[in-house]
Amino acid sequence: MKTNKLKQQKGTLLRVLQYVKPYRVLVIVSLLCACVSAAAQLLIPILTGKAIDQMLGAGQVNLSGVLVFAVWIAVVAALSAIAQQFLATSNNKIAYNISRDLRNAAFHKLQRLPLSYLDAHPSGDLVSRMIADVDTFSDGLLMGFTQLFTGVVLIVGTLTIMLIKNWMIALLVVVLTPLSMFVASFIARKTHHYFTEQARVRGQQTALINELIEGQKVVQSFGHEAASLSDFNCINDELGRVSLNATFFSSLTNPSTRLVNNIIYAAVALVGALSAVGGGISVGDLSVFLSYASQYAKPFNEISGVVTELQNALACAARVFSLLDEDDRVPDKENAVVLSPKGTVDLKDVCFRYVPDRPLIEGFNLHVKPGQRIAIVGPTGCGKTTMINLLMRFYDVNSGAILVDGTDIRDATRHSLRKSFGMVLQDTWLKAGTIRDNIAYGRPDASEEDVIAAAKAAHAHSFIRRLPDGYDTVITENGGNISQGQKQLLCIARVMLGGENGELPPMLILDEATSSIDTRTEIKIQSAFARLMNGRTSFIVAHRLSTIQEADVILVMKDGHIIEQGTHEELLKKQGFYANLYQSQFALS
């Protein structure tokens, strides 16, 4: 188990280094700055010792010599400060560039992931990986570059000078140093596990908060505040527990290594004092050794803290890399066809299931002629919306085939397939921006006149005009400052504006497109839809059967099969499932 964890950490570290590679020039600059800063820090104790040796006792002070060394100490200290400033700037660029690259890679990965992955993972957890985990990784990386470079150079330089000055005292330091490294290594192994858990639970908490914010109206309407608070408290307590464990073990690092380093310092002071009394070294050299013993210990304290932070950073990086390692959706074939369809659609023996042992659609066959209006009705969970997902190739069929103008959609480019459909869904989605931006989402270069014409066709112009800023009204996240019905009207206007070059797509998908609109507006919209659907192959998913009476063919689905099909009048005459469904709706109304 430990071996696997070490392999995972090593693998994560190697992948991090791949992200560092493009910035190797900055890394070299950081190393040079670290060397200059460390050399300056190493030189100051020597200059201080020389200055002390200019003061032999009362009345035996070489003031001019002391002043010379004092000036040199000031110059070297200034040089060290300048080098540290350049080091910090260079390290900031490295850390922020790497975090930007990692976040870019994660976002581009999201664009390539299959819809099945996004459906199966809470959006809050994905947001946590891309924001919180990358930020934590960046902070740990910045601390690592800033303190690790200087610390390593200081340790090597200090040890070298101590060996030159007095190898016996230096040997004492070398013998005791592994104690500090052992303590830091032991604590680092403990903290990695807890930091990994902390990142995982933080992702779950973000997902829960995101879910509760989006569904707050439902939560309050059902009086579910107490239960929601209980769920949050449960996961918050778990996050507190793992965070406390991570903090506890990481906080042990500094005092533990400091204790060991204080022992080293005391041993050097004792042995050095005995050597000075015996005339083995001067008082100035003893002060140099004591400074170096302290300086030698300090990087170990800092590096032990860096190791702890790097454990946290690697744990967060591993979560981001696990996202990057997910399989992409099936790519377009190399010789994929660019569709320019007229509107013929064939479903041949289509079978599909979300879960391997739970069939949803089985042996589905359908032939749709260009310009036909196909309505799909049936009870919840019968596969209506799944059919739309398959037509748009958000999911691929498990067996069988879907053909558009005789071409298997798996042999066509996704872009050309989806461009061939205009789609209005029940779940409205608007991007942050102005109303104009949202209507022109599929056609950014549309003129003001075209945008207004589309809004009028969708009967959205009147409510837009009443808004304080009209078409320049900024919509908050997912349209939170307008009603659900108004959002749906904007989505309809978006389709009515058309795609590239202002051309309307040859096929339409309307999935409960008027479910949130009042009856009077719906009647007006239906007439606009009738004009829009004229000559275009249209698939209409509906729960309200009053909206699909003019369809050329109504497909009645149940348990993934077509159990009835025909026009509205034909199905009513059959007195079957559709007739019962229709009569029950109107009886309820």
Task: Annotate each language-model stretch with its function.
Residues H224, F248, Y265, Q295-L323:
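Cytosolic ends of transmembrane helices, especially the final helix of ABC transmembrane type-1 domains
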